[in-house]
Amino acid sequence: GIRDDLVTGVQTCALPIFKKIIIFNYDSEKTEHPYISLETILNNNEMDETFEEFPFDHPIYILYSSGTTGYPKCIVHGAGNALIEQMKELILHCDVKENDKLFYFTSTGWMMWNWLIAGLACKASIYLYDGFPFYKNNDCLIKYCEDHQFTLFGVAAKYIDQLKKEKFDAKKYNLKNLKTITSTGSPLVKESFVYVYEKIKKDVHLGSISGGTDVVGVINICNPFNSIYAGEIQCPSLGIDVDVFDENGNSTKIDEKGELVIKKPFPSMPVMFWNDKTEDKILNAYFRKFKNIWHHGDYIQKTKNGGYIIYGRSDATLKPGGVRIGTSEIYRQVESFDEIQESIVIGQNYKNDVRIILFVKLSYQAKLDDELINKIKKKIRINCSPRHVPSKIISCPDIPRTKSNKIVEISVRKIINGEKVDNIEALANPNSLEFFRQLKIDD
């Protein structure tokens, strides 16, 4: 919630190819650097509209994956490839129309910013907020939505979960133009679907969506013409041949969990990986597990409603007794407790098997005593299964996360199992790992 002056930092980081840096809502007397104001540009009618033509797949974005599963991938995306995919998602799936107002709670380092920019091609206006979403009050973003009458309000699932936990009621705000809320970053649980319709807006299209930096877009997405089922993503994105495979590469039955795959090429596949002349990196990233099939790395289930439920990253799944358990199944139960602010769950190698270790970051003044531990275990046992119940529940001061706000189960798992963690520069709070390095878990 601390305000900071970024102008000097921008000047320091400016690349030689930058001709001008644009600022707005800033007192020009505070800086000696050569800037041009946004107002000056908007008031200038002398526009040079001569643009150089490039091939459809000419590189436009270099994006780095979040680093939750290892070193970040340096992914190059093509201009036309990304744009046609994103416009399809916005116009056909999210019902974006000319003169709409689109907002996404994202930093410029997350691919949702690139997705938001495509709104301009849909003749919509776009709005950005980069900062703490509860600055001063928990209504910060909702008030922003009201003030500008957004038609699409895009946020992370964790943001909705936190509003629900704080019992925030948005019904007093004027959100008359809001027609779509999209949620991404992690699975949106059933209870948060219910919360949105009860406490934010009852006649809104709530779309849980999932894709990634790898495709600079969405794979499973919302559909304004279909029914919404709490906890489910409505459908695959149009033109993307989504399926769920078992470990042997066979399609799973309805309601069986497996690996998210794409069986045919699609427009927004990466043009290449940077510094990958042999294409070994890109092939290893997506095509090694199943021959000629894109393996996305999500643990997922197709439902009888035609939708999908994502249970977490495939390589973060828990395997006690050899049975795969998605991490989101446990998070849904644990984070319903007011005493728990956030949690992270991993599998620890133990006596030729794997046991589940749950770490919890407590809410202010909450205490992890035997009573709370037993309540957590009981809820997990009743709503999931005895296999889901953690062997240990441990309080931790902070949850390690990437700069795009994704928790890093794999890094914590490696530390607990005595393995080296290489990619700490991808973390927003690398010092949080020190607690886990010093931890000794007894029997």
Explain the meaning of each model-derived region.
Residues 22-23, 33-36, 40-64, 71, ...:
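Conserved pre-ATP/AMP-binding loop-to-beta segment of ANL
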Residues 124, 150-154, 164-228:
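Gly/Ser/Thr-rich phosphate-binding loop
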Residues 83-101, 111-151, 166-168:
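Conserved AMP-binding/adenylation subdomain of ANL enzymes
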Residues 1-13:
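Single conserved hydrophobic/aromatic residue that forms the stacking wall/gate
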Residues 249, 396-421:
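Flexible lysine-rich "adenylation lid" loop at the C-terminal edge of ANL adenylation domains
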